[in-house]
């Protein structure tokens, strides 16, 4: 285990992918079931079309769902894994986040990234640019979001936690060090320590305590869900996520991880 990180409680997150569910009630029932089985945080994603399966299948919009989830749940945290920075003016996004924070009673996590799915951009009229330009736009947007959150009346109910996903060592991890409360990585347990070390160097460069950043990662099923979860915990990850999609939203993996978390 990375001894430089604090002893945080292990938390379980579920990404309820808002695809292939032709009726909203299917998603609503899934987020309520997440709360019932003890999931700590329910995520969706910020796309306009399915990422797999029928490319033109049923799909719902991210932030409208989060506002509904805020009313339809009472304990679980909610957020996007992750919001695409390109799709909304930073000041507007800050106001949206503040509003959902209030609706939920302080349970929103603001997950954000630079965006990557070209079909979303092309179909909805956004400039796709390059990976580098999108990261530069994210770097410019984050201070604007923070500034607007500080000006809004009423203010957020809490300092809304910011989650940034990705592992780019030069730009993305620098943004994590500067702005994030949670870092979501897509690295395996074997790859993770090297990425975490890069993040620690960025934190040192910007004067940030790396222990202030919670580490999050997706748990893969191949080779065993629980062993894979434990391997991530052993290298310092404490927010463990799994994903499922519609129409059925099978929460078997999430329930397994919740039981494992509670038995530790």
Question: What are these model-predicted stretches?
Answer:
Residues 1-264:
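Active-site-adjacent structural elements that line small-molecule/cofactor binding pockets in enzymes
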């Amino acid at each position: 285990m990375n001894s430089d990180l604090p002893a945080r409680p292990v938390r379980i997150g579920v990404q309820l992918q808002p695809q292939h569910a032709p009726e909203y009630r299917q998603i609503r029932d899934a987020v309520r079931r997440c709360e019932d089985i003890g999931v700590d945080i329910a995520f969706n994603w910020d796309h306009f079309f399915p990422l797999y399966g029928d490319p033109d299948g049923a799909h719902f919009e991210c932030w409208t769902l989060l506002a509904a989830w805020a009313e339809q749940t009472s304990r679980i945290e909610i957020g996007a894994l992750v919001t695409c920075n390109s799709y909304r003016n930073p000041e507007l996004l800050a106001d949206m986040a503040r509003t959902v924070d209030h609706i939920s009673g302080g349970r929103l996590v603001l997950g954000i990234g630079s965006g990557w799915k070209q079909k979303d951009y092309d179909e909805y009229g956004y400039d796709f640019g390059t990976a580098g330009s999108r990261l530069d736009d994210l770097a410019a947007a984050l201070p604007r979001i923070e500034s607007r959150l500080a000006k809004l009346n009423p203010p957020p109910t809490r300092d809304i936690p910011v989650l940034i996903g990705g592992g780019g060592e030069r730009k993305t991890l620098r943004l994590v060090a500067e702005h994030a409360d949670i870092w979501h990585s897509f690295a395996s347990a074997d790859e993770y320590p090297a990425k975490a070390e890069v993040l620690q160097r960025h934190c040192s460069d910007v004067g940030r305590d790396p222990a202030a950043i919670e580490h999050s990662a997706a748990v893969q099923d191949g080779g065993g869900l629980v062993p894979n979860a434990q391997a991530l915990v052993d290298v310092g990850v404490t927010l463990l996520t799994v994903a499922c999609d519609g129409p059925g939203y099978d929460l078997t993996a999430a329930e397994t991880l919740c039981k494992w978390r509670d038995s530790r």
